[in-house]
């Protein structure tokens, strides 16, 4: 997962609070215990400050996880950390919803608030 893949562009409306929601319904990674693929939906919601996340670079960033052995919780926190590092949003929430494995689903949500 190469953070340097991520790109941003200038926010044309930095004086206005507005929410951007990005959904990736086809996210994949690998279970570090079993080596089997994990499938999930990643939702990123954020209020930008000076920059916005460029979507093509985000797509390629997400593809970096495809062969990575990483737990759900770590995926979610890593994505938040990397996106906050490159875009410095006013606030951001990353929610990952994972398909059933053994009849159990999991959802992980993590947030960042710049004013906190």
Swiss-Prot record:
Coiled coil: none annotated. It is found in: Cytoplasm. InterPro entries: GTP-CH-I_C/QueF (IPR043133), NADPH_dep_7-cyano-7-deazaG_red (IPR050084), QueF (IPR029500), QueF_type1 (IPR016856). Substrate binds at residues 53-55, 72-73. Catalyzes the NADPH-dependent reduction of 7-cyano-7-deazaguanine (preQ0) to 7-aminomethyl-7-deazaguanine (preQ1). Pfam families: QueF. It comes from Chlorobium luteolum (strain DSM 273 / BCRC 81028 / 2530). Pathway: tRNA modification; tRNA-queuosine biosynthesis. The keyword Cytoplasm applies. Belongs to the GTP cyclohydrolase I family. QueF type 1 subfamily. It is an enzyme of class 1 (oxidoreductase). One of its GO terms (biological process) is tRNA modification. SUPFAM superfamilies: Tetrahydrobiopterin biosynthesis enzymes-like. GO terms for cellular component: cytoplasm. Its EC number is 1.7.1.13. The keyword NADP applies. The active site is at 31 (thioimide intermediate), 38 (proton donor). This is NADPH-dependent 7-cyano-7-deazaguanine reductase.
């Amino acid at each position: 997962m190469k953070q340097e893949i991520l790109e941003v562009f200038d926010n044309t409306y930095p004086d206005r609070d507005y929410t951007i929601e990005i959904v990736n319904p086809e996210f994949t990674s690998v279970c570090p215990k079993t080596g089997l693929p994990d499938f999930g939906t990643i939702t990123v919601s954020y209020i930008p400050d000076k920059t916005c996340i460029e979507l093509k670079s985000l797509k390629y960033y997400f593809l970096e996880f495809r062969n990575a052995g990483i737990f759900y919780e770590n995926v979610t926190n890593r994505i938040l950390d990397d996106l906050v590092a490159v875009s410095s949003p006013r606030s951001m929430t990353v929610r990952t919803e994972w398909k059933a494995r053994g009849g159990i689903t999991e959802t992980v949500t993590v947030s960042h608030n710049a004013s906190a």
